[in-house]
């Protein structure tokens, strides 16, 4: 900052001092002419005021007369209030303008602080073009590298999907085979059981009902022979067939009469009977005996028909069960095939997904390889461009060295 002192000649002060900035190590000085011009005082006005810094040779006698005159003038000026006010106003104005100029210079210097020396203009335009191309290729190289990495991840995911699909395919095929075998075995077992039961029923009918029918049929034939023998005529032959006895017995809860011991014996022999004495066959049977035999014959024939119907119905039911069991066993293969086909269908779907995943894997792998190849080509091109830039810089440096040598020469 500038300090104004009253009683000091402004012209002498401005001519003998310069405005400096004490805070800067290498400050820029401001001349008095610049300060006076900034406040509107030109050189001509300074000359008119008698404040010009230009010195001239003093007139003779000045060295002895002037000091007293100047001293008197200064003493009078100090006492003059108007003069002091004018000088103070002039000093304040000069100080303000000087501070403004100094601050402007300081701001300009501070704005230039931190700037580096720009050598961009010294390089060749071809180098700048190659540098831009190098930056572009580097960007492309990075993009290719990222794309290759992502495609590798896609390929890996597709491989994992394929592996999972293969596992699911195997599980579906296995479950289908197990379901088919289990269902077929179960249905075959049911059919075999029904067929076996039908065979057992038919066997039981033949064992029980057929035996009863045979026994009743034999009894019926015996009774018919006795009844039919009443109309026969004896021709005098010896040892004529005869029915010696007729036994009566109970069967079950119903009281029935049974004809036993119908034998062919000679006339000389006799037999003992339990209930009725029967004469020789060549003799007539009493009507009472004929009625009993006829009634028994009807009962036996009724039992034969009943047993025959029972056996036929049992055999029909048994055959029906056998046919049902055989049909179930034959259809077990078809039903089991349907169950197995469902598993094969699921396995086929998984196989189609495997094919899609494999295609995705191949496409991603191929694209990843192409991206890596493009990245390698970009790297090679960048290296070639760097070599070209180095060659250009070396040529430029050689040319500048030659020019500098010529200038020194």
From Swiss-Prot:
Pfam family name, one: IpaC_SipC
Molecular function terms, GO-annotated: identical protein binding; syntaxin binding
Listed GO CC annotations: extracellular region; host cell membrane; membrane; phagocytic vesicle
InterPro entries for the chain: BipC/SctB
Cell location: Secreted; Host membrane
Membrane topology: Single-pass membrane protein
Record-annotated membrane-spanning stretches: 119-140
NCBIfam families reported for this sequence: IpaC_SipC, PRK15373.1, T3SS_SctB_pilot
Family to which this protein belongs: Belongs to the SctB/SipC family.
Protein name: SPI-1 type 3 secretion system translocon protein SctB
